Amino acid sequence: MSMQDPIADMLTRIRNGQAANKAAVTMPSSKLKVAIANVLKEEGFIEDFKVEGDTKPELELTLKYFQGKAVVESIQRVSRPGLRIYKRKDELPKVMAGLGIAVVSTSKGVMTDRAARQAGLGGEIICYVA
Protein backbone atom coordinates (compact mmCIF):
# COMPACT_ATOMS: atom_id res chain seq x y z
CA MET A 1 0.00 0.00 0.00
CA SER A 2 1.39 3.39 -0.96
CA MET A 3 1.68 6.34 1.38
CA GLN A 4 -1.23 8.78 1.03
CA ASP A 5 0.40 11.92 2.47
CA PRO A 6 4.23 11.87 2.58
CA ILE A 7 4.43 15.44 4.00
CA ALA A 8 2.19 14.50 6.95
CA ASP A 9 4.45 11.47 7.47
CA MET A 10 7.52 13.75 7.52
CA LEU A 11 5.94 16.07 10.11
CA THR A 12 4.87 13.08 12.24
CA ARG A 13 8.40 11.65 12.16
CA ILE A 14 9.77 15.02 13.36
CA ARG A 15 7.13 15.23 16.12
CA ASN A 16 7.72 11.63 17.27
CA GLY A 17 11.51 11.94 17.05
CA GLN A 18 11.53 14.99 19.31
CA ALA A 19 9.07 13.38 21.74
CA ALA A 20 11.50 10.44 22.04
CA ASN A 21 14.55 12.78 22.28
CA LYS A 22 16.12 11.29 19.15
CA ALA A 23 19.19 13.02 17.71
CA ALA A 24 18.03 12.51 14.11
CA VAL A 25 15.18 11.06 12.05
CA THR A 26 15.31 9.56 8.55
CA MET A 27 12.63 9.31 5.89
CA PRO A 28 12.30 8.81 2.13
CA SER A 29 13.40 11.96 0.31
CA SER A 30 11.61 14.16 -2.24
CA LYS A 31 12.19 17.65 -3.63
CA LEU A 32 9.32 19.09 -1.56
CA LYS A 33 10.58 17.46 1.67
CA VAL A 34 14.07 18.87 1.05
CA ALA A 35 12.58 22.34 0.43
CA ILE A 36 10.57 22.12 3.69
CA ALA A 37 13.68 20.92 5.57
CA ASN A 38 15.62 23.88 4.16
CA VAL A 39 12.98 26.33 5.46
CA LEU A 40 12.99 24.63 8.89
CA LYS A 41 16.81 24.87 9.02
CA GLU A 42 16.86 28.56 7.98
CA GLU A 43 14.28 29.37 10.67
CA GLY A 44 16.24 27.44 13.34
CA PHE A 45 13.75 24.64 13.99
CA ILE A 46 16.18 21.85 13.00
CA GLU A 47 19.97 21.63 13.29
CA ASP A 48 20.75 20.29 9.80
CA PHE A 49 19.62 17.92 7.06
CA LYS A 50 21.28 15.77 4.42
CA VAL A 51 20.18 13.55 1.54
CA GLU A 52 21.93 10.19 1.14
CA GLY A 53 21.56 7.41 -1.43
CA ASP A 54 21.17 7.35 -5.20
CA THR A 55 18.48 4.82 -6.10
CA LYS A 56 16.26 5.43 -3.05
CA PRO A 57 17.39 8.72 -1.48
CA GLU A 58 16.88 9.11 2.28
CA LEU A 59 16.46 12.49 3.98
CA GLU A 60 18.08 12.68 7.43
CA LEU A 61 17.06 15.56 9.71
CA THR A 62 19.21 16.40 12.73
CA LEU A 63 16.77 17.58 15.39
CA LYS A 64 17.41 20.61 17.59
CA TYR A 65 17.00 20.91 21.36
CA PHE A 66 17.43 23.86 23.74
CA GLN A 67 18.16 23.14 27.42
CA GLY A 68 16.90 19.58 26.95
CA LYS A 69 13.58 20.64 25.39
CA ALA A 70 12.55 20.28 21.76
CA VAL A 71 12.73 23.52 19.77
CA VAL A 72 9.60 22.57 17.79
CA GLU A 73 6.66 22.96 20.19
CA SER A 74 4.02 22.12 17.60
CA ILE A 75 4.09 21.12 13.95
CA GLN A 76 0.76 20.79 12.18
CA ARG A 77 -0.25 19.87 8.62
CA VAL A 78 -2.69 22.36 7.07
CA SER A 79 -3.19 21.68 3.36
CA ARG A 80 -3.60 17.98 2.67
CA PRO A 81 -4.27 15.86 -0.43
CA GLY A 82 -8.02 15.70 0.29
CA LEU A 83 -8.41 19.39 1.10
CA ARG A 84 -5.91 21.85 -0.34
CA ILE A 85 -5.69 25.23 1.43
CA TYR A 86 -4.60 28.21 -0.69
CA LYS A 87 -4.28 31.81 0.55
CA ARG A 88 -3.59 35.11 -1.18
CA LYS A 89 -0.71 37.29 0.05
CA ASP A 90 -3.03 39.42 2.23
CA GLU A 91 -4.71 36.31 3.70
CA LEU A 92 -1.50 34.54 4.82
CA PRO A 93 -1.83 33.60 8.51
CA LYS A 94 0.44 34.71 11.36
CA VAL A 95 1.27 31.69 13.51
CA MET A 96 1.34 32.43 17.26
CA ALA A 97 1.25 36.18 16.51
CA GLY A 98 4.47 35.94 14.50
CA LEU A 99 6.44 33.64 16.87
CA GLY A 100 5.81 30.59 14.67
CA ILE A 101 5.92 30.16 10.91
CA ALA A 102 3.62 28.93 8.19
CA VAL A 103 5.45 27.02 5.45
CA VAL A 104 4.00 28.16 2.11
CA SER A 105 4.49 26.64 -1.34
CA THR A 106 4.50 29.52 -3.85
CA SER A 107 5.27 29.88 -7.54
CA LYS A 108 8.79 30.97 -6.49
CA GLY A 109 9.37 27.91 -4.28
CA VAL A 110 8.77 26.90 -0.66
CA MET A 111 9.17 29.73 1.88
CA THR A 112 7.87 31.10 5.17
CA ASP A 113 4.73 33.21 5.43
CA ARG A 114 6.91 36.28 6.16
CA ALA A 115 9.03 35.77 3.03
CA ALA A 116 5.91 35.20 0.92
CA ARG A 117 4.33 38.40 2.28
CA GLN A 118 7.50 40.38 1.47
CA ALA A 119 7.64 38.91 -2.04
CA GLY A 120 3.93 39.66 -2.52
CA LEU A 121 3.08 36.01 -3.15
CA GLY A 122 0.29 33.72 -2.00
CA GLY A 123 0.22 29.96 -2.24
CA GLU A 124 -0.57 26.64 -0.61
CA ILE A 125 -0.18 26.56 3.19
CA ILE A 126 1.75 23.32 3.79
CA CYS A 127 2.08 23.43 7.60
CA TYR A 128 2.36 25.53 10.75
CA VAL A 129 5.48 25.28 12.94
CA ALA A 130 5.84 26.88 16.37
Curated annotation (Swiss-Prot):
This is Small ribosomal subunit protein uS8. PANTHER family: 40S RIBOSOMAL PROTEIN S15A (PTHR11758). GO terms for cellular component: cytoplasm; cytosol; cytosolic small ribosomal subunit. It comes from Escherichia coli (strain K12). InterPro entries: Ribosomal_uS8, Ribosomal_uS8_CS, Ribosomal_uS8_sf. One of its GO terms (molecular function) is rRNA binding. Part of the 30S ribosomal subunit. Contacts proteins S5 and S12. GO terms for biological process: cytoplasmic translation; regulation of mRNA stability; regulation of translation; ribosomal small subunit assembly. It holds the Pfam family Ribosomal_S8. HAMAP family: Ribosomal_uS8_B (MF_01302_B). The keyword Lipid biosynthesis does not apply. Belongs to the universal ribosomal protein uS8 family. Keywords: Repressor, Ribonucleoprotein, Ribosomal protein, RNA-binding, rRNA-binding, Translation regulation. One of the primary rRNA binding proteins, it binds directly to 16S rRNA central domain where it helps coordinate assembly of the platform of the 30S subunit. Protein S8 is a translational repressor protein, it controls the translation of the spc operon by binding to its mRNA.
